[in-house]
Amino acid sequence: MVQRLKTLYLESAVLKLQETFGYKNPHQIPRIKKIVINCGLSEASQNSKSLESAMKELSIIAGQKGVITRAKKAIAGFKIREGLPIGICITLRGDSMYAFLDRLINLALPRIRDFQGVSSKSFDGHGNYNLGLKEQLMFPEIDYDQIDKIRGMDICIVTNAKTDSEGFYLLEVLGMPFKEKFAN
């Protein structure tokens, strides 16, 4: 089954991007390569149940199992030893990536209280977009009664766009609700 957002990209976004930026080769047209969902857990080193709970919630949201990230080196100030679990990371590609992005844009983001749009200033200089969410409850798959703690997550949308303006236009054509227009 072809995802709705992938169809939108192939049928209209490619033409709009080609027309706007004047690409001659179809391989120059920006596309989304992957989406990385990251959740840092400060309490994971003391409480293994919180790690399991967060893993379950992120797996429900993303549709695939995550990888536990471990501390690379010890930091005494944070009471972290080398090898302790400190977070969860999920990388989405292909149809699952488009399905997640579709749910994020059309279901999750509009459920945020007082939502006016996402910032257009979160591009990294190479066309990739980073978004931080304060709670996982905005996703309809998560039930309020089933969670033990409200956790946030970082979402990184990686594109092969050369500039931020190309990445902005790609996400805008796909329906990302930006607060303001992109300014260099």
Curated annotation (Swiss-Prot):
Subcellular location: Plastid, Chloroplast
UniProt keyword terms in alphabetical order: Chloroplast, Plastid, Ribonucleoprotein, Ribosomal protein, RNA-binding, rRNA-binding
Entry coiled-coil feature ranges: none
A GO molecular function held by the record: structural constituent of ribosome
GO biological process: translation
GO cellular component: chloroplast; ribonucleoprotein complex; ribosome
Stored HAMAP family: Ribosomal_uL5_B
Stored NCBIfam families: PRK00010.1
Its job: Binds 5S rRNA, forms part of the central protuberance of the 50S subunit.
Sequence similarity: Belongs to the universal ribosomal protein uL5 family.
Subunit structure: Part of the 50S ribosomal subunit; contacts the 5S rRNA.
Designated name of the protein: Large ribosomal subunit protein uL5c
Organism encoding this protein: Mesostigma viride (Green alga)
Gene: rpl5
